[in-house]
Amino acid sequence: MSMLFYTLITAFLIGIQAEPHSESNVPAGHTIPQAHWTKLQHSLDTALRRARSTPAAAIAARVAGQTCNITVDPRLFKKRRLRSPRVLFSTQPPPEAADTQDLDFEVGGAAPFNRTHRSKRSSSHPIFHRGEFSVCDSVSVWVGDKTTATDIKGKEVMVLGEVNINNSVFKQYFFETKCRDPNPVDSGCRGIDSKHWNSYCTTTHTFVKALTMDGKQAAWRFIRIDTACVCVLSRKAVRRA
């Protein structure tokens, strides 16, 4: 709303400077035609109508989108060293069902740019044979609202949420895995002899290549994301008589 206000003020000031205050200030043969004032008035009326009809929130969102609209060359995604099975650029959210968690899916006829050959990922507890259990319960989800992350140098960087590729807006998704519960059972990890061991489940991390902001330009960086849930063991102190 403030940008439209400044535009109206600028146009108004230009009109004041051009308006003749008296006949003596206007050189002979250089009078401003009436059509100029009519056109200026029409432009001001149109701008006022748009300002009244457009919500302030919509204007702010549009301006923010223009400042964050980063165009990326699609040839960047053809470099094998920049591909990661845990990073995906897509126009729509990836499927969440366990039986459709395919990284090679296509949305709206356009395949993701950084598609890989890894077939499926389960978004819930992995499937085991009868009688087999996992020592820790994990949950895996596609994260599409990541704004900041820690890079490989330990610095906090800004992650690009959306990029413009071939005039289409692609969102950057990260496939993250974390522990569902640090203690799946009362004693800690499942199946651990609590008489001799202390145990608990913890989320581990790895670094993946992602598009981040470097000043006013997009840049590839290694950022840390959650990738696994493991059991940590420590031997209990032996009590001697």
Swiss-Prot record:
Glycosylation, residue list = N69, N114, N166
Q: Any signal peptide, and if so, which residues?
A: 1-18
The molecular function terms in GO held by this entry are: growth factor activity; metalloendopeptidase inhibitor activity; nerve growth factor receptor binding
List cystine links: C136-C201, C179-C229, C189-C231
Q: Which GO terms describe its cellular component?
A: axon; dendrite; extracellular space; synaptic vesicle
Tell me which Gene Ontology terms the entry assigns under biological process: cell surface receptor protein tyrosine kinase signaling pathway; modulation of chemical synaptic transmission; negative regulation of neuron apoptotic process; nerve development; nerve growth factor signaling pathway; neuron projection morphogenesis
Where does it reside? Secreted; Endosome lumen
State the function annotated in the UniProt record. Answer: Nerve growth factor is important for the development and maintenance of the sympathetic and sensory nervous systems. Extracellular ligand for the NTRK1 and NGFR receptors, activates cellular signaling cascades through those receptor tyrosine kinase to regulate neuronal proliferation, differentiation and survival. Inhibits metalloproteinase dependent proteolysis of platelet glycoprotein VI.
Family membership noted in the UniProt record: Belongs to the NGF-beta family.
Query: This protein is called what?
Result: Beta-nerve growth factor
What species does this protein belong to? Pongo pygmaeus (Bornean orangutan)
